[in-house]
From Swiss-Prot:
Protein name: Ditrans,polycis-undecaprenyl-diphosphate synthase ((2E,6E)-farnesyl-diphosphate specific)
Lineage: Bacteria, Pseudomonadati, Pseudomonadota, Gammaproteobacteria, Enterobacterales
Gene: uppS
Cofactor(s) for this UniProt protein: Mg(2+)
Residue stretches in coiled coil: none
Keywords: Cell shape, Cell wall biogenesis/degradation, Magnesium, Metal-binding, Peptidoglycan synthesis, Transferase
GO terms under cellular component: cytosol
Disulfide bonds: none
C-alpha cells in the first residue's frame, strides 16, 4: 500500500483516536535504582507495563502499537544486562503466545534479529507465524532496531532491484523508500510517546514519524498505566495536525 495513500488516510482521521501509536519505553533502569533494586528488576516490571499498554490499545480500538524494546545501540550495555533482557524477551514470548492468539493480536518484530541466539529467533518466527492471520491489534516489537538501519536496508533493496533491471532509477520516490522499510504495510505513526523524561527520538522510526505528534512524560516506563496512556491520547486528539499545511482559520 502506498505511503501517500496511507498518509491521506491519517489526514482524514486525524480528529479521531490515533491509529498507530509508537512508544519509546524509557526509564526501567532508573526505576529499579530508585527502588533500591538491580536494573533487571526494572525491565521485569516494565514487562507488566507492556501488558497494560496492550490491553489499553485493544480496549480503545487502536490498530497498531509499536514498542521500542531494544535498540541497535543497546548492545553497549553490560553483558549481564543484555543476557537478562534476551531471557526476558524469550520468557515473554513463551508465556504470552496464548494471549496473543486469544485476543486476536498479530505479532511482528522489526529489526535485525540475526544477532539473537537461535532459540530466541525461533520463538520470534513461531509467534509471527502463528499470529499472522489474526485481524486485531498489530503489535510491533522493535528489537535490535535503529531508524538509520531501517532506511539503509530499504536503500539496499532498492539498489538491488535497480541493478537487476526491475526498477527504473528515475521512478524512485518517497513511496519507494517506504515500501521497503520494515513497516512497509502499516499505517504511518500518528503518535509517539516517550516515557522517562527525556525529549529525544533516539534513532526510532526516523522515516515513519515525519508527521507524527510527539508526547513526552516524566513517568518512568514501569509506572506507565492506562491513565497516562489516555492522557497522551487526549493530548493527541486536542491538537491540530497540519501535515505541512496551515491552520484552518488562517487565510
Amino acid at each position: 500500500m502506498q505511503y501517500k495513500y496511507l498518509l491521506e488516510y491519517n489526514k482524514k482521521n486525524h480528529e479521531c483516536n490515533p491509529c498507530h501509536v509508537a512508544i519509546i519505553m524509557d526509564g526501567n533502569g532508573r526505576w529499579a535504582t530508585r527502588q533500591g533494586k538491580i536494573r533487571i528488576m526494572g525491565h521485569k516490571e516494565g514487562f507488566r507495563a507492556v501488558k497494560e499498554a496492550i490491553k489499553f490499545s485493544i480496549a480503545n480500538n487502536l490498530k497498531i502499537l509499536t514498542l521500542y524494546a531494544f535498540s541497535s545501540e543497546n548492545w553497549n550495555r553490560p553483558l549481564f544486562e543484555i543476557k537478562a533482557l534476551m531471557e526476558l524477551f524469550l520468557f515473554a514470548l513463551d508465556t504470552e503466545i496464548k494471549n496473543l492468539k486469544k485476543h486476536n493480536i498479530r505479532f511482528k518484530v522489526i529489526g535485525d534479529i540475526t544477532c539473537f541466539d537461535k532459540k530466541l529467533q525461533n520463538s520470534i518466527h513461531y509467534a509471527e507465524q502463528i499470529t499472522f492471520d489474526n485481524t486485531g491489534l498489530i503489535l510491533n516489537i522493535a528489537a535490535n532496531y535503529g531508524g538509520r538501519w531501517d532506511i539503509i536496508e530499504s536503500v539496499k533493496k532498492i539498489i538491488n532491484r535497480v541493478q537487476r533491471g526491475i526498477l527504473d532509477v528515475n521512478k524512485i520516490h518517497e513511496n519507494t523508500i517506504s515500501q521497503y522499510l520494515s513497516t512497509s504495510e502499516l499505517l504511518p505513526v500518528d503518535l509517539v510517546i516517550r516515557t522517562g523524561g527525556e525529549k529525544r527520538i533516539s534513532n526510532f522510526l526516523l522515516w515513519q514519524i515525519a508527521y507524527s505528534e510527539l508526547y513526552f512524560t516524566d513517568v518512568l516506563w514501569p509506572d506507565f498505566n492506562c491513565h497516562i496512556f489516555q492522557h497522551a491520547i487526549d493530548s493527541f486528539v486536542s491538537r491540530e495536525r497540519r501535515f505541512g499545511g496551515f491552520k484552518k482559520n488562517k487565510k
